[in-house]
Structures are given as structure tokens and as C-alpha cells.
Amino acid sequence: MQGQTKSVSFDGREIKLTTGRFAPQAGGSVMIECGDTSVLVTATKSSGREGVDFLPLMCDYEERLYAAGRIPGSFMRREGRPPERATLISRLIDRPMRPLFPGWMRDDIQIVATCLSLDERVPADVLAVTGASMATLMAGIPFQGPMAAVRVGLLGDDFVLNPSYREIERGDLDLVVAGTPDGVVMVEAGANQLSEQDVIEAIDFGYEAITELINAQKEVLKESGIKQEMPKAPEIDDTISTYLDKNCTKSISEVLKNFDQTKEERDNKIEEIKISISAKIDGLKDDNAVKKSLSLNNKLLENSYKALTKKLMREQIIKEGKRVDGRELNEVRAIEADAAVLPNRVHGSALFQRGLTQVLSTATLGTPSDAQEMDDLNPNTDKTYIHHYNFPPYSVGETRPMRTPGRREVGHGALAERALIPVLPAKDTFPYVLRVVSEVLSSNGSTSMASVCGSTLALMDAGVPLKAPVGGAAMGLIKEGKEVRILTDIQGIEDFLGDMDFKVAGTEKGITALQMDMKITGLPIETIGEAINQALPARTHILGKMLDAIETPKDNLSPHAPRLLSFRIDPELIGTVIGPGGRTIKGITERTNTKIDIEDGGIVTIASHDGAAAEEAQRIIEGLTRKVHEGEIFPGSITRIIPIGAFVEILPGKEGMIHISQLSEARVEKVEDVVKVGDQVTVRVREIDNRGRINLTLRGVSQNGGMSNYPEPTPTPVAPLT
């Protein structure tokens, strides 16, 4: 089981591609390794199913926690449903692979990438994408590869190729670019308000590095003896398409050029034309070639009609520069935006509408304990900003069962989340956990970018002090030969019939998120740069409309949002606050009706709907962690009495004891002869013993009326609380 291994020196690291050793019954397999990260990728094809008119491609990324030396935290101690991270990486593999299969393919194809070992210096996702290409080539599946992917980071002014998790966290850019010899096929990025030029240069930097990985795949394929052949597309009976072209072109074109109609009216008219031509074909004689052709393939009419509509729409854009709704190529649809559309039981809300796309976003403020714990291979285990995206069937006028969120919902939520993270306030100034939910109420393209806009408004309505508002738009592309047209703010039909969906989100200062998907085999950097630059004025326009709804974040939180106080204590004193078995902290929470979270670094966060209660809890904790020194004088209250002395609370939650011999200069027979529970006294710290116990005295301390004949001592200064 030696297999064949090809090593590539890549930016000072070695990437190994091993084929022929693992998963021998898979169609094709490769173990791709870099450092201690190992990903096994397999590609398998089975014969197509009858009646399928699309490519049934399945891409699955699987994580095994043993890859990081961990045991799953579930009851069964076994990996269960794929975590969100695995779903996102599955999409990351699918998006650059799908456009590289021939459009006529209908066979079932499954690509499975399994992370078997993880090195925190080498993320597995880009290795899985490159491995998917190699495995597909080894399987002999018709495929317009090779394709490879790299990650680009930005530390200071320098681009970093395939940065580690730590470098990604420290840097201002996390960009993944995938490409073929023909150009870039996929881009995904999160950025800290970077300029358009910086992002374009980063994509170019990454694409240049891809060449080495593409060449390595070619060499492995050559040495394996597997020939990469692209079979000819099956011959398609053009009888129907010719008939439709002759009988429907004029009527469809008239509908597409009627800019005064609504989307519903346009869709209905196009459907009416199809029904009419179908009835006309039914009336033909049985020996007619058109009718014969249709009898052999009942989906031929549907597919040919869609193809004709697509061709006519694209020709209208290329030749006339007009879109189906009459907009110019760089024009944004009409925008409406409103904040505070729900009662303040919801901490923040907003409604954002662009054309027929409408999204309701809500923001909820939570406490640190509401952070999402991620049981996956990502070393960053907690999420304090969570964005969920819901796409119900009624948003497109359809009916279907309501199920758990699919990959699309997870992916769109993650993109909107990524777009807003760079503008969220620092944790030490605004310690809330934030959850935003975007409900798509109506969809006609670019719902993810509408979610970004609506979520910004909802967070501002909730009083979250964002560094800057974030807006976004989806850019489209029509490419016919050398003719290229870039579209701003694409709607549904342009997404469906076009060649690109390029989402760009950011602030006035710069870009915060990108996601580009292609339906063609690659685009040059120049065209991508043109699309990014064309998105800037659109984003500026959108942000202006958003600020008309709410100009700045609200000064006050919803009265139904928790109030948080955050401060720092000495980490060594965390145990003092928690107490034996958690008794101390439990007592504080019960006494003040608050919720208290303490991080390992000593950051204490107190949550309460009553600000005074939160301040009381803070006072108690600061008292517990306040260092007491010998000689200091404190007012206090007698809390309990024992035969040998009395206990005094000198600070919130902190007690010391007055021994019976320290109650008076004279001999005392019973403690109750001098003090009782509830008495207010002034005490001096006599000593702190080696067990940290505080011993107090009344001797020599004035009691505002003279419990002692000694002169009043000079007060000892108390260090300010920090």
C-alpha cells in the first residue's frame, strides 16, 4: 500500500499529495497533507437517475475530533450532526467544483473530504478544496480541472499565504481564492474594512500561488497513467429548440422589453407563452417531427423554453444594455428601510426592502453565558456574535414542508455574520453576546446582502455601538464570448440566468466580506476588479438610504434588555468569589437577583434587568476581592456571635472576627455584654494570619460615643478600588 506521493514546496512549506494508497474502492482518492494536517478526499461517480435534469453533486466535509486529540462532548461520545463549520467547508468545496463539470452531466457525483489530523498552523479547508480536484481527476470523471485553492491573510502591510489560525485572527484579511488555468472560479473573504485595491491585490496574490498546485496535480495525473478526457456532449435533438426559436422569440422578447410590468406580471406572461406553444404542439399531427421529438423526452419543451428565455435576456443586456426591469447596468433597485418595526420586547428590529426582496432582522442582547460553544476542530471555541438566516417557502410564493435550516441558510447566515464582525464593539466596552436573526419575507435576489443591511439597522436600533454601518449588494455578470457586462444589484432572474453571483459588503471605509460564485470556468483578475469597483458606488448609495432610517445607534438599550456591568478582578481571587462548591457566588446571585459570569482572565460580567441590583453585586464582589491590610479601620456590622468572639462584615461579603479579648480594655465575660447582632461598630485590622483570616479589634478605636477611653486614632488611607 505504498501509493504514489508528489511533494510541492509551497511558500516554505511542503504539501504532499498521496494517491493510490487510501480508499481503494472509491472512484478516486488523495491524501493531501501539510504540516500535521491530513485530509483524505474521495470522489465517486454512479450512473445517473432517470428524470434528473441537473447535476446531482454532493460535497461533504467530515470532521473527526480525534484529528485534534479530542473526544466528542456528546452523551454518546460520538460525532453527530455535522457542525456549522463542516457545513460551510462543504459549501466551500462545492462552489468552485460545480461549474467545472460539463453542463450535460447528470451522473451522481459525491466528494467526501475527511479531516484525519489537524495542525493549528495549517487550516484544513483549502487543502480539502484542492484535494477535491485531485480526487475527481483520479476518478476519471469528466471535469474541467485541475483547480486549486489557497488562503491569503494580511499582517501589517504584507500578504501571507495560507496563514495559521492565529495569524488569521490577528490579521485584517481572511480570503480564500480558488482557480483554474482559465481564471478565478471562487472567492470568499472576511476583511477589516479594506480598500477595494487591497482586496483586488490579495486575490491576484492568491491566484498567482495557485499555479504551483495546479501543475502538481497535472504531474500526479500524468504519472498515474490516467488520461484526462472530456467526452463529447450528447447530441441534443434541436427540433424543439428550432421550433421555439421560430414561434416564441418575438413574444418572449416583447415581454422582456416591457419595463412597466411587475415581476409577477412578467413571470405570468412568460408562462402563458409556454402554455400556448405547448397547446399548439399538441395540435400538430402525430407524425410531425416536433411532436415525435417531444414524445421521446417530455422535459425537452421545458428545458428548451428556459434556454430560449435565457438567451434572449442575455442578448438584451449585451446588445442593448437594458435589464428586464428597465434598470441601467449599474443601477440599484428602489430601497425602503425602517428601524424599530417591532415592540421593544424585541431588543432591536428593522425592515429592509430592495425591490421585491424584503428582510426583517432582529437583534437580541444576551449575557456571556449565552455564547455559543462550538464542538468542532476550530480552536476558537466560543461565538459571541451569532447570525441566523431563515428562508421560508412563502418568501417565493411556494409551499413546502418547514424543516431545519439547510446548507444555503447556514451559508447565508455565516456571510452576513462575517460582514458585521469587523464593526462590532470591543468585548471589554460592550460585553453582550449578540444574536441577529434575518427573516426573509420576500425574495427576488440578493437576500444575503439585504440581511446585512437589515441586521446593521437592527443592531443600531438595539443600541449596539457599531464602529460603522455595513451595507452590501450582489453583483452579476453576463459573458458572451469577449463581450462582458457587469450588473449591479442582481435580481432573481439575473442570478438564475447569469454567470456570476458576487456579493460585496462593507462600510464607507472599506470591504468587510466577499463571496463570489461562478457558473463559468474562470474569470480574469481584471474583470473581478471591475466588479469590486462597480460595487462601491452602489454600497455608498445603499448606506445613505439606511442612514435615513436611523443615523446613529440608539443611546439607550431596550428596557427589556439585560444590563451588564463588566470589570476585572485578580485572577488569583476567582476562587474567593466562587467559594467552596460555588456557595459564595450563588449567594450573591440569590441576594441580588443577578446573573454573574467570570472568565479565566478575571473579567467579571454581571447581568440584571435592575441596574441597582447589578451595582450591589459589583460592590459585593469588589469587597470580596479587595485586599485588606493590617492597621486599616473599617465600619462594619456584627453578623454573628460565638462564645469566643463576634464576626463583623467589614466589606461586602468579607468578614473578620473580634476575639472576646479585643472587645474592650476591661475583661469581658460574655460577648453579648458588649455587642449584639446588628450593631454597627468601627474596627481596626489587628492582623491577618497565615491562613488569610482577618482578626479585628475594638480596642483603641473610637465608636462615635465612646466605647473606648482611648483617643480617636488617625484614619488609615484606603487604596482606591481598581
Curated annotation (Swiss-Prot):
Q: Show where the KH domain sits.
A: 562-621
Please give the biological process terms from Gene Ontology that the record holds.
Answer: mRNA catabolic process; RNA processing
Q: Name one GO molecular function term.
A: magnesium ion binding
Q: Which cofactor does it need?
A: Mg(2+)
**Chief location of this protein within or outside the cell:** cytoplasm
Indicate which residues the UniProt annotation says bind Mg(2+).
Answer: 495, 501
Reaction catalysis annotation: RNA(n+1) + phosphate = RNA(n) + a ribonucleoside 5'-diphosphate
Q: Does the keyword RNA-binding apply?
A: yes
The subcellular location is: Cytoplasm
Q: What class of enzyme is it?
A: transferase
- Give the residue ranges for region: Disordered: 700-722
Keywords assigned by UniProt, alphabetized: Cytoplasm, Magnesium, Metal-binding, Nucleotidyltransferase, RNA-binding, Transferase
Reported EC number(s) for this entry are 2.7.7.8
Q: Bias category Pro residues: which stretches? A: 712-722
Q: Which SMART domains match?
A: KH, S1
Q: Name one GO cellular component term.
A: cytosol
Give the function comment from the record: Involved in mRNA degradation. Catalyzes the phosphorolysis of single-stranded polyribonucleotides processively in the 3'- to 5'-direction.
Record-stated family: Belongs to the polyribonucleotide nucleotidyltransferase family.
The protein depicted here goes by the name Polyribonucleotide nucleotidyltransferase
Q: What organism is the protein native to?
A: Prochlorococcus marinus (strain NATL1A)
Gene that encodes it: pnp
